[in-house]
Structure formats: structure tokens, C-alpha cells
Amino acid sequence: MYGSTEELWFVEWEFRGTPYANRALYEQWSPLDFASKWKTPMLIVHSQNDYRVDLSEGYQAFTALRKMGVPGKFLYFPDEGHWVLRPRNRRLWWGVVLDWLDQYLRPGAVTGTR
């Protein structure tokens, strides 16, 4: 994600420098290295105009879920940024999130890999 966000300060602070100066720490916490252990269903929400987290990051996570058979859903907003702010989109966001939580958190819900 480094280099594809406008918020480099956060990444450099959390990882104590750039990936060029502290590669080991970046590799230690790379989601890609943990993806093979994912079992929890995930709802990924992304927007085209999000300059904080690049859209490709969400696609990579969703692709990993699909390849491993972990339940996942990708909700995409072509006209939003890092926050979903438009009223119509917020209603959709809330509906999808609440349906997702109901599907996986209600008593007797299916969890883990299908």
C-alpha cells in the first residue's frame, strides 16, 4: 500500500520508516502473508475516489477470499472517497452492512469456509 496512499505519515510511523529502509517490518505485517489463514467471512467496501486506500488493495483481498473459498462480498461505490457520504450510498451501505452482520452473526449463522 505504501506509495498508493496520500497518507504516508501513518504508514511510515506505524512501520518505523519506509519500506526501503525497514523492509522486514513491512513484510512481517503484510496481509498477503496472512491471507492463507483467513477463515472469517469478510465484507469489503471500497470507493473509486479513495486516495487513502487504493482500490486495488480491496480487489486483492477479495480475490484472495474467493480463491480460498472464504465467504466474501465486495461493495463498490464509483462516486465516493474514503468515506461514504452521499445519502443514497449511505442507505445502501447501511443495508448491506446490516444484512451482512445478520447473515453471519445471528444464532445458527454459517461461519468460516464454505
Question: What residues fall within each predicted segment?
Answer:
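Active-site-proximal cap/loop segments of hydrolase catalytic domains
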Residues: 1-114
